[in-house]
C-alpha cells in the first residue's frame, strides 16, 4: 500500500474531487509532506496539485490547498502554465474567480507567450473572459505567433464573444499575426460564418487584405470549402474572385490543390472563372494542380466543367506527368482512362518514366510483375 502523501494517490484524489479523503491523507502525512516534493513526480509537465485542481475544476480543493497548505498560486509547470492558465483554458469560472480573488497575475505568460485570456478565448465561455477582462486582462497582448485574444476568438467563431471584445477594446481587431494574417483570414479559413458576418459589420478590414503569401480571406474560404463565406465576402466585402497570391495562383488553383469540388463549381459556374486559367509563375492550370496533388475526384470535376485534358505547363509536362511524378496511381489511371496519352516533356521524358510504384507501372505495362 502506498504511504501517506504518495503523489499518484494525491493526484487521483484531486482529479476525482475527493476533498475529504485528500484532507485526511495530508493530515496523516503531516510534516512529512512538502508541496514542492510533488512537483515533477507526475510526469514531464511538472504540475503541482493546484494545476490539477484548476484543470479539473475542483474549486473547493483549490481553496483548501491554498489556504491550509499555503501552496503558491503562481507556481509554474515546465510549460510556464500557472493554475490560472489551467482554469481559464478549461472554462472553470469558479476556479478562475477564486484565483483572481487571491491575487493571481492576470496576464501571466506561459510557453509561447499565451495569457490566461488567450486560453479562455479557445473556449466559448463568455463569463470567464469577462472575469479576466474585468480584473485587468489586456486583449491586445500577442503571443509568439502574433495572435491576440481577438484572433483566437475569431478562430472559435462565437459572435457574442467577438462583440464583447470589440466593446471593451474597440481597436482589438486592428491586428495581424507575424505572417500578416488577420482575424478575418482566420474566421474565413475555419468556416465561422457568423464570426465573418460580425467582423464585416463591426470592423474595417481592407477588401482582399493579404498575408505574407498573398492569400486573401476569400482564398482561405474557397480552399477550405466554405462557399457560403466566400459568397458573403463577395457580396459584403467586395472581394476579388480572381485575385492572385504571391505565386500567381488564384482561388481556383488553391481549391484544386485541396480538392474542394463544390468551391470549384461555384467559381466556374457561378462566377464565370475560366477553368483553364493559369497561375502566373508556374503556368499550371487547376487540372495540373489537382493531378499534382493526386486529387482524382477534382480532376474528374474539372474535366466535367470543360478543362483541357491536354494542357501542359511551361516545361510541357501534362497532368499525367504530374500525377506520375507524385506516384498517384488512381489519378494517373483516371487520366489515361479519360483519354490522356503519354507524351514527352521538354527534356524528352515520358510520364511513365517518372513512376516508381509497381501499381502505376502495371497500368502502363500489364506485363510488369509485382
From Swiss-Prot:
Cell compartments where the protein resides: Cytoplasm; Nucleus
Name the source's superkingdom: Eukaryota
State the SUPFAM superfamilies in the record. Answer: Ankyrin repeat
Q: One GO term of the cellular component aspect? A: nucleus
Q: What does the UniProt entry state concerning the protein's domains?
A: Side chains of Lys-111, Lys-144 and Lys-174 capture Ser that is misactivated by AARS/AlaRS.
Q: What is annotated about its quaternary structure and interactions?
A: Interacts with AARS; the interaction is direct.
Q: What is this protein called?
A: Ankyrin repeat domain-containing protein 16
Amino acid at each position: 500500500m502506498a504511504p501517506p502523501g504518495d503523489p499518484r494517490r494525491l493526484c487521483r484524489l484531486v482529479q476525482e474531487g475527493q476533498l475529504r479523503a485528500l484532507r485526511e491523507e495530508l493530515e496523516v502525512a503531516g510534516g512529512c509532506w512538502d508541496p514542492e516534493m510533488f512537483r515533477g513526480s507526475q510526469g514531464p509537465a511538472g504540475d503541482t496539485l493546484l494545476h490539477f485542481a484548476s484543470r479539473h475544476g475542483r474549486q473547493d480543493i483549490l481553496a483548501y490547498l491554498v489556504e491550509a497548505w499555503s501552496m503558491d498560486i503562481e507556481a509554474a509547470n515546465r510549460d510556464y502554465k500557472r493554475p490560472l492558465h489551467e482554469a481559464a483554458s478549461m472554462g472553470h469560472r469558479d476556479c478562475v474567480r477564486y484565483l483572481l480573488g487571491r491575487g493571481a497575475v492576470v496576464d501571466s505568460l506561459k510557453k509561447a507567450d499565451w495569457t490566461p485570456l488567450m486560453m479562455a478565448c479557445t473556449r466559448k465561455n463568455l463569463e470567464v473572459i469577462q472575469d479576466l477582462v474585468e480584473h485587468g486582462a489586456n486583449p491586445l497582448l500577442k503571443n509568439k505567433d502574433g495572435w491576440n485574444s481577438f484572433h483566437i476568438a475569431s478562430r472559435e467563431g462565437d459572435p457574442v464573444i467577438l462583440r464583447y471584445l470589440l466593446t471593451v477594446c474597440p481597436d482589438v481587431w486592428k491586428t495581424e499575426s507575424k505572417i500578416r494574417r488577420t482575424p478575418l483570414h482566420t474566421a474565413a479559413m475555419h468556416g465561422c460564418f457568423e464570426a465573418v458576418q460580425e467582423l464585416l459589420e463591426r470592423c474595417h478590414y481592407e477588401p482582399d487584405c493579404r498575408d505574407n503569401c498573398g492569400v486573401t480571406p476569400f482564398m482561405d474560404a474557397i480552399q477550405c470549402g466554405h462557399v457560403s463565406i466566400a459568397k458573403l465576402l463577395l457580396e459584403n466585402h467586395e472581394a476579388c474572385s480572381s485575385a492572385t497570391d504571391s505565386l500567381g495562383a488564384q482561388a481556383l488553383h488553391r481549391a484544386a490543390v485541396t480538392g474542394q469540388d463544390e468551391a470549384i463549381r461555384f467559381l466556374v459556374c457561378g462566377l464565370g472563372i475560366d477553368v483553364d486559367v493559369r497561375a502566373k509563375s508556374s503556368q499550371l492550370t487547376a487540372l495540373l494542380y489537382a493531378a499534382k496533388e493526386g486529387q482524382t475526384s477534382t480532376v474528374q470535376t474539372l474535366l466535367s466543367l470543360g478543362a483541357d485534358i491536354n494542357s501542359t505547363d511551361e516545361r510541357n509536362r501534362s497532368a499525367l506527368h504530374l500525377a506520375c511524378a507524385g506516384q498517384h496511381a488512381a489519378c494517373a489511371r483516371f487520366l489515361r482512362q479519360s483519354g490522356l496519352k503519354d507524351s514527352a516533356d521538354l527534356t524528352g521524358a515520358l510520364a511513365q518514366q517518372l513512376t516508381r510504384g509497381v501499381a502505376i507501372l502495371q497500368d502502363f505495362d500489364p506485363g510488369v510483375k509485382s
